[in-house]
Amino acid sequence: MPPNLTGYYRFVSQKNLEDYLQALNVNMALRKIALLLKPDKEIDQRGNHMTVKTLSTFRNYVLEFEVGVEFEEDLRTVDGRKCQTIVTWEEEQLVCVQKGEVPNRGWRLWLEEEMLYQEVTARDAVCQCVFRKVK
């Protein structure tokens, strides 16, 4: 049975974000802003229905989906693209595959005690983010 990721998580650290944003062809000005942000995550998991919110002072992003059901994701607020997305469980990790213009794009989320780990990929770039559960 997959873990319940429901909760509010505060940003702790990130590694390799600029390379990831460059792989998405995000312009330098937006990359510099993104590097200053410390976004929080809010996750609501109700069975196979999930809402994952990325919250920051600059921009918020809300992703709502059914696990295992492919959908069109509008990433215009992130990098100006749309893609076909599917999110599934692999063991205890929530895994997202985003098919579109950018190869090898997606992310993974998993819990280790009170820490939420996120790994995002695009092309050959891999970025790791860590969040601490606060409620």
UniProtKB/Swiss-Prot annotation:
- The protein's superkingdom reads Eukaryota
Q: Which family does it belong to?
A: Belongs to the calycin superfamily. Fatty-acid binding protein (FABP) family.
Q: What is known of its domains?
A: Forms a beta-barrel structure that accommodates hydrophobic ligands in its interior.
Which keywords describe this protein according to UniProt? Cytoplasm, Retinol-binding, Transport, Vitamin A
Say which species the protein is native to.
Answer: Bos taurus
| Tissues/organs with expression | Kidney.
Question: What is the name attached to this protein's record?
Answer: Retinol-binding protein 5
Which pairs are disulfide-linked? none
Q: Extract one GO BP annotation from the record.
A: fatty acid transport
Biological function: Intracellular transport of retinol.
Tell me a GO cellular component: nucleus
In its UniProt record, a GO molecular function of this protein is: retinal binding
What Pfam families does the database record attribute to this sequence?
Lipocalin
- Subcellular location(s) of the protein: Cytoplasm
